[in-house]
């Protein structure tokens, strides 16, 4: 779950895309990898507070202690917001802890503890076009009638052991476990005898282990070659219940089942320099995924929905990189992947009945070619990609917050990605652009028997998006910056009869620093940001194929946030 990533203590965020991301496993068309920073040797502490428009309140604090042999980082934050829209308040508390131990020069042990508590996240629901245009801050009537909201609690612990066996071989062992509790009140009662209920209650436990062996050596040519083999095994058990929503109060039982999902993956990767300027990468991942449902709510109106599905697939990938110059690399990658439906995607079938065991895994073929240039003061990335999938898992309908999915063949995504960054003295400009041509290659029948024509665009995808930003730091104390985000129109349904218009949204930010980074000193940071500078009205997200026509989730208007942070070094 992306919400549990704790960005205040992150050292870096990496976005891995393209065919080589398939090596990360099932559904890895892309990977967002958040790495928590290591504890600072010698110790440090910091605390901050921020206030913003619409009742935004944020406090956070972190503490580092220990040395190079044993270090600990603890980070705690709390956020609240009254909400820009009616019925959109939320609050959450997040703890992130990291321990790094180096018992000897060849061994590193890393432990991560993440605790996430979100007791309240009100849902104002989507708006239809008339509501969106007349008053984007409103909540629809059923949101207050049924008190639509969600609470989430997730705790997880992971341990990684890295050990250098000898000069060529290294071993990594991983283990993790966690729990997740979710209660969600939807915008209908779910009182019918064959309904799954209008209140979702999940209690989930999950754990897994993994190992990887890496050998780094040199070929007879003297060029490096590295190979890795590994094994992952994961298991998730879930108790899913559904209750009648009695105007925001949980009522009679309507669903009761135990769900299980397991996967076992074997993978290997080879990385070799075949000449001083040519590098080849190849690998595969063989996966077995099984999903089981054990139904315990069986009545004459609600028959036994127990069942199971198993999927097996091998995802091969290959890539080639040419170092044309010391600053320019050209590359090409190709691969195949697959995506099994999640328990959430299988949870409902048409007619508001039980699990959708007819949902199949999606299979894709993708390739990309690109170039990466890194000069003395600027860098440029260019990539052209093409992905074609069979059995694409798409939402056929979403009614009252509940989504039903189906498979669609010959879904195509192709496009161009550009990213540029430069350092020009005190100025740091950045720009990125994406052209995405995503469409259904075959006709199919959607919700309510609607005919979806070949060539219709995938809903929720903009053909053009761009980001422009510039930072200016005239001194080591001052910094100011501006951003501009642009996006084209986006269709909201498979029939392409409803759409959200494109938008251009600007923002400003500034910061001032007091003190220096000398050990034993205190450094103060003052910052401010102004989002949606010109108070543009636009849809931040869409509820694709909403059965009630409430597709649009408005983004917040102009908003200001200011904060102060103290660092004790």
Map each language-model feature to its residues.
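Short loop/turn motifs that connect adjacent beta-strands in outer-membrane beta-barrel proteins
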Residues: 39-44, 68-69, 105-106, 164-170, ...
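Face-selective signature of the C-terminal outer-membrane beta-barrel domain
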Residues: 106-114, 151-298, 321-323, 381, ...
């Amino acid at each position: 779950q992306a919400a549990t990533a704790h960005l205040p203590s992150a050292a870096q965020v990496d976005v891995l895309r393209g065919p080589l991301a398939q090596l990360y496993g099932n559904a890895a068309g892309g990977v967002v990898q958040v790495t928590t920073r290591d504890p600072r040797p010698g110790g440090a502490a910091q605390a901050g507070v921020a206030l913003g428009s619409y009742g935004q309140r944020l406090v956070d604090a972190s503490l580092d202690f220990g040395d190079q042999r044993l270090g600990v980082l603890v980070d705690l934050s709390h956020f609240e917001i009254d909400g820009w829209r009616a019925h959109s308040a939320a609050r959450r508390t997040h703890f992130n802890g990291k321990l790094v131990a180096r018992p000897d020069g060849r061994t590193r042990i890393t432990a991560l503890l993440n605790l996430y508590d979100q007791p309240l996240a009100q849902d104002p629901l989507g708006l239809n076009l008339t509501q969106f245009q007349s008053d984007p801050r409103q909540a629809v009537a059923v949101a207050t009638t049924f008190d639509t909201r969600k609470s989430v609690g997730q705790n997880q612990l992971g341990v990684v052991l890295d050990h250098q066996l000898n000069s060529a071989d290294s071993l990594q062992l991983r283990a993790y476990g966690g729990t997740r509790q979710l209660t969600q009140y939807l915008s209908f009662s779910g009182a019918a005898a064959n309904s799954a209920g209008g209140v979702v209650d999940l209690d989930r436990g999950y754990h897994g282990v993994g190992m990887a062996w890496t050998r780094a050596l040199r070929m007879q040519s003297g060029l490096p070659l590295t190979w890795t083999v590994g094994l992952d095994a994961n298991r998730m058990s879930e108790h899913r219940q559904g209750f009648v929503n009695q105007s925001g109060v949980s009522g009679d039982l309507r669903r009761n089942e135990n769900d299980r999902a397991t996967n076992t993956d074997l993978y290997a990767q080879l990385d070799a320099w075949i000449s001083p300027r040519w590098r080849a990468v190849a690998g595969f991942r063989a996966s077995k995924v099984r999903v089981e449902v054990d139904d315990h709510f069986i009545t004459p109106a609600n028959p036994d929905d127990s069942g199971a599905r198993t999927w097996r697939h091998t995802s091969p990938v290959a890539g080639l990189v040419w170092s044309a110059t010391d600053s320019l690399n050209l590359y090409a990658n190709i691969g195949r992947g697959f995506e099994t439906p999640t328990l959430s995607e299988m949870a409902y079938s048409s007619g508001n009945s039980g699990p959708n065991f007819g949902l199949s895994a999606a299979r894709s073929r993708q390739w990309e070619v690109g170039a990466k240039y890194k000069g003395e003061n600027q860098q440029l990335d260019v990539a052209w990609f093409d992905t074609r999938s069979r059995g694409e898992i798409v939402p056929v309908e979403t009614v009252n917050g509940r989504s039903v999915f189906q498979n669609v063949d010959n879904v195509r995504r192709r496009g161009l990605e550009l990213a540029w960054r430069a350092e020009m003295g005190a100025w740091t400009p950045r720009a990125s652009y994406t052209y995405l041509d995503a469409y259904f290659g075959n006709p199919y029948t959607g919700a309510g028997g609607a005919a979806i024509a070949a060539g219709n665009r995938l809903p929720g995808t903009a053909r053009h998006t761009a980001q422009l930003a510039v930072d200016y730091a005239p001194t080591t104390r001052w910094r100011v910056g501006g951003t501009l985000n642009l996006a084209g129109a986006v269709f909201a349904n498979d029939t392409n009869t409803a759409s959200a218009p494109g938008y251009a949204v600007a923002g400003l930010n500034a910061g001032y620093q007091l003190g220096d980074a000398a050990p034993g000193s205190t450094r103060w940071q003052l910052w401010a940001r102004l989002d949606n500078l010109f108070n543009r009205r636009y849809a931040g997200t869409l509820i694709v194929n909403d059965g009630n026509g409430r597709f649009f989730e408005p983004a917040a208007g102009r908003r200001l946030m200011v904060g102060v942070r103290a660092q004790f070094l």
